């Protein structure tokens, strides 16, 4: 019999393995394997215990704990929580309006009695609709709900009114176009009006236009004078023309073939 020490990777776990002389290698391997399993179980238990300890430590932080739904006692913490929750509430309301097209009105008073509101399209319009709906009597609501003919008549009247409004809009647009055209035409010939009827802006525009017209006339006159001088200067130069000489008739004399100077 001899004793051997079986040591796991963990330095704190060490077991003496007693081996008898008559034991075979298979028995020794089996005992070693069972010890290895024991060490692995102890290691897994220790790892699980470590994880539980770490999780318990994490739960101690405020961010990981579940906040109880009771009034916050400390005033500064209560004010900070109100600001954060109010911003989150308004953000969720805005998302609901954007996604679903809902009309929402929210009024919140802070612990310091300061009001904050959020509304789409506005708080006033939502409140007006709510108040007007509550002021409607039960008999009127039942009458509207119980008479389909009245609802159909109201829809027809609404359609007729909307069509009239659309026609009036078209007429208004046409009149606006006519007014703009009239103003444009009056602005084109505004200088034909008497000077006494012009305002300061029109007088300044007329002065500027006359100055520009004078510059244009002077420039054109200078160009015209230069062209005139060139033409008349060319005409003033004398051009000598050889005198006509009477020569006897004949083909050779007319075309001067005799001298070899014929010109066609």
Swiss-Prot record:
Q: How does it assemble?
A: Interacts with PHE1/AGL37, PHE2/AGL38, AGL80 and AGL86. Forms a heterodimer with AGL80.
Which cellular component appears as one GO term in the record? Answer: polar nucleus
Organism (species):
Arabidopsis thaliana
Q: What is the protein name stated in its UniProt record?
A: Agamous-like MADS-box protein AGL61
Q: Which GO terms describe its molecular function?
A: DNA-binding transcription factor activity; protein dimerization activity; RNA polymerase II transcription regulatory region sequence-specific DNA binding
What the entry lists under Gene3D superfamilies is as follows: 6.10.140.920, Transcription factor, MADS-box
Q: Where in the cell is it found?
A: Nucleus
Instruction: Name the CDD domains on file.
Output: MADS_MEF2_like
Signal sequence extent:
none
Per UniProt, which keywords does this protein have? DNA-binding, Nucleus, Transcription, Transcription regulation
* Known tissue expression: Expressed exclusively in the central cell of the female gametophyte and in early endosperm.
> What PROSITE patterns does UniProt report for this protein, alphabetically?
MADS_BOX_2
Among Pfam families, the record links this protein to: SRF-TF
């Amino acid at each position: 019999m001899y004793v051997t020490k079986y040591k796991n990777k963990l330095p704190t776990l060490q077991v003496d393995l007693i081996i008898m002389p008559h034991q075979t290698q298979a028995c020794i391997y089996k005992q070693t394997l069972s010890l290895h399993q024991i060490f692995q179980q102890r290691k897994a238990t220790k790892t699980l215990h470590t994880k539980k300890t770490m999780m318990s430590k994490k739960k101690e932080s405020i961010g990981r704990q579940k906040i109880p739904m009771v009034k916050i006692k400390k005033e500064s913490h209560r004010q900070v929580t109100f600001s954060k929750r109010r911003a989150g509430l308004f953000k969720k309301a805005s998302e609901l309006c954007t996604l679903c097209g809902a009309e929402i009105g929210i009024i919140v008073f802070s612990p310091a009695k300061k009001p904050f509101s959020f509304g789409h399209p506005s708080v006033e319009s939502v409140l007006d609709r709510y108040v007007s709906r509550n002021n409607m009597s039960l008999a009127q609501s039942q009458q509207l709900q119980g008479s389909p003919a009245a609802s159909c008549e109201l829809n027809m009247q609404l359609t007729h009114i909307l069509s009239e409004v659309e026609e009036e809009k078209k007429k208004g647009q046409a009149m606006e176009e006519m007014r703009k055209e009239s103003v444009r035409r009056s602005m084109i010939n505004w200088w034909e009006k008497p000077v006494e009827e012009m305002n300061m802006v029109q007088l300044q525009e007329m002065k500027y236009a006359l100055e520009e017209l004078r510059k244009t006339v002077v420039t054109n006159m200078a160009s015209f004078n230069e062209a005139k001088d060139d033409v008349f200067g060319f005409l003033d130069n004398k051009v000598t023309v050889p005198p006509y000489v009477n020569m006897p008739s004949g083909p050779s004399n007319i075309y001067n073939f005799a001298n070899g100077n014929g010109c066609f």
